[in-house]
Amino acid sequence: MASTYLAKTYSGSGNRQRQTISFWMKRYKTGAGQVVFSSYYTSSYYAYVLLGGDDRLQYYNHNNVNVETNRKLRDVNAWYHICITLDTTQATEADRLKIYINGVQETSLNTATYPAQNAEVKFGDNNLHEIGRHDGGSYFDGALSHFHFVTNTAYQASSFGLTDATTGEWSINTAPSVTYNTNSFFFFFF
């Protein structure tokens, strides 16, 4: 997927305070900045979910939101489930944005600048959204599956995955109970 992407410009805004981004990914290349999902309005107003050059997962939004894991995602043979939940209405700062990898919340963070209470992010706004790149570059080099973007609800990772009783591994929930609202979507991709 090193030069392919999907793009959509929304005509109106969805809920920008409560959201969920959930997807499964397999990386083909590490050590280079790769954007999985982005929202772009201008060079000053944008957001993205990025795998940095150091292979850490990062959620960035132009209005001083920057949350990056300490964990590095370097295994090109593994599928990773990523779930990012946003609820800026929460009183506790760390509850406003959570990152889960394979069903486990990442609490050891390299950077943790959370959204202000009741802030709105660029994802879900009436601007360009892209899966697989940001503003014409930083292409994601890998495979994606079961990609959900949901506005209006901050679902937990357990809505999209479950622990296999036989193997003990985190696996895809192929029939999640999810409500898709304005500007929400689901792509199977596999």
Task: Label each PLM-derived region with a short phrase.
Residues V65-N66, E120-L144:
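Extracellular glycan-interaction patches encoded by glycine-rich segments
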Residues S38-Y40, A47-G52, Q58-H62, T85, ...:
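Beta-strand-rich, repetitive solenoid scaffolds
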Residues I21-K29, I82-I84, I131, L144-F149, ...:
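Short hydrophobic/aromatic patches on beta-strands that form ligand-binding or substrate-lining surfaces
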Residues M1-Q19, V65-R74, R133-G136, S171-V178:
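Short surface loop/edge beta-strand patches of beta-sandwich-type extracellular domains
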Residues M1-Y5, A91-E93, K98, V104-T113, ...:
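Extended recognition patches within non-cytosolic domains
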Residues Y45-A47, N64-T69, V104-N110:
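Surface-exposed loop/edge segments in extracytoplasmic proteins
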